[in-house]
């Protein structure tokens, strides 16, 4: 008899979450790296009690050019799609990956981080849809805060002097492995992860690499 309450609760949750939703992401702004997918529920939909972070089996998920979509379940990546189009979420199937232009490297990362979960009674799941901006992010300015001491030596003319050098310019970058970015950098963001959150770190490493060369 100890299963009655859990069974009743599970049944009620299933009834509330059984209707299809549609997850999508509008064009991602150039200053945004990751954004949580929006759930579209029509005004005539009866699915008003569905859990916020539950994806109903049969839900549609749209992916646009320049985006990579991942589904995260209990903090672990279980689905990846970098191919533009519309897809149907089927909870009964094994994890899938549509690598698109990301290539074989994303397959290896996916094999490393994926993990399936099973629960009894309540759903016990937190499922989220995230979209990554995979376009090239341009016009990132950098510059040395202070002059860099540099020694100039030319033994042919007997030159050996110390000079100070400054440098500045722009660079671009893109997210080539969204799974690594999720697991090592952004994690479960509430709504979105902006490029300004890693801007200082990127500039510091970029200038440091220039100094070493």
Name these PLM-found stretches:
Residues 1-212:
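N-terminal hydrophobic membrane-entry segments
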């Amino acid at each position: 008899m100890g299963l009655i309450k859990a069974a009743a609760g599970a049944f009620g949750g299933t009834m509330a979450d059984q209707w299809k939703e549609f997850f999508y992401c509008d064009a991602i702004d150039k200053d945004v790296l990751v954004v949580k997918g929006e759930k579209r529920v029509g005004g005539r939909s009866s699915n008003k009690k569905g859990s916020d972070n539950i994806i109903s089996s049969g839900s549609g998920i749209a992916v646009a050019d320049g985006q990579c979509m991942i589904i995260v379940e209990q903090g672990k990546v279980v689905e990846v799609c970098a191919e533009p189009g519309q897809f149907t979420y089927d909870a009964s199937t094994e994890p899938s990956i549509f690598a698109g232009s990301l290539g074989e490297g994303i397959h290896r990362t996916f094999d490393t981080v994926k993990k399936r979960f099973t629960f009894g009674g309540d759903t016990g799941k937190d499922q989220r849809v995230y979209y990554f901006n995979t376009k090239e992010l341009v016009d990132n300015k950098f510059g040395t805060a202070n002059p860099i001491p540099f020694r100039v030596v030319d033994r042919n003319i007997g030159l050996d002097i110390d000079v100070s050098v400054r440098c500045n310019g722009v660079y671009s970058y893109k997210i080539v492995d969204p799974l690594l970015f999720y697991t090592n950098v952004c994690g479960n963001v509430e709504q979105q992860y902006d490029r300004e959150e890693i801007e200082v770190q990127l500039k510091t490493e970029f200038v440091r690499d220039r100094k070493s060369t």
